[in-house]
Every structure is written in structure tokens, then in C-alpha cells.
Amino acid sequence: MQVRDELAAALQRAVKGEVRFDAVSRMLYRTDASIYAIEPLGLVVPRDEDDVAAAIAVAAANGAAVLPRGGGTSLAGQSVGAAIHLDCSKYMNRVLEFNAEERWVRVQPGLVLDELNAYLQPHGLVFAPDVSTSS
């Protein structure tokens, strides 16, 4: 428990975003859409790229794994694990750059497929991977 508290305190000093190491948050993030349930060390909801870098640096300095997480819709357990979960879906969910002529887009990691395709649709484009979930 003391190690978890020290890790949470170090993350709170390092990031501007949310740091959640409470039992309820850990319970909510222990599952995805699969049958697996593994309690995370805690959760960081980064506000920006600097928060992501800071969280990874704190984790590395403390020997903790980091697991990026989107919507938690994995059907095979990729988004659960005994790690610090980085949930970018709240603040880092925008289209950053789009070039219609060259047909490319740069997005933040929390943007979901349906939102990307809604952005691209007026330009007659679609990002076509067929994933199990897209919202």
C-alpha cells in the first residue's frame, strides 16, 4: 500500500491531469469488454503530451509498467493489466492536423474511430479498419 501511495504522490506532483489511485477507480479499470479482470496500480488521465511523458518518466523511475487505454472495449484483454493505466480519452481526443489533398490526418490517442470518421466524412474520406468496436 505504501508503494502505491508513494507512486500516486509522485504522479500528482508530475502531471497536470487527473491521478486516481482510489479503490473505486482501480475497480472500474480492472476490466474491459473481455473476460479478464486485472486490477491496475492506478490511473492517470493526462491533459496533454507533457503529462504522458511525465507519467511515463515517473513510472520508469519506480519500476512500474504503463498501459495506454482507450475505451476499454478490447475483446481480448489488451486494456487490462497490473500497470499505471493512461486514459487519453477525456482530454486528448482531437484531430490535430488534416491534409485532404495528401489524404492524411494526425490525431491525439484518445480519439475514437467513429469521431474520426465523422470528421473525415464531409471530405469523402473514411478510415476503414474494421475493429470490433469503434465508439
Locate predicted features:
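Conserved PLP cofactor-binding pocket of PLP-dependent enzymes
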Residues: 69
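Short acidic, glycine/serine/threonine-rich loops at helix termini
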Residues: 77-82, 117-119
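A glycine-rich phosphate-binding loop feature that marks nucleotide/adenosyl-phosphate handling sites
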Residues: 25, 75-77, 134-135
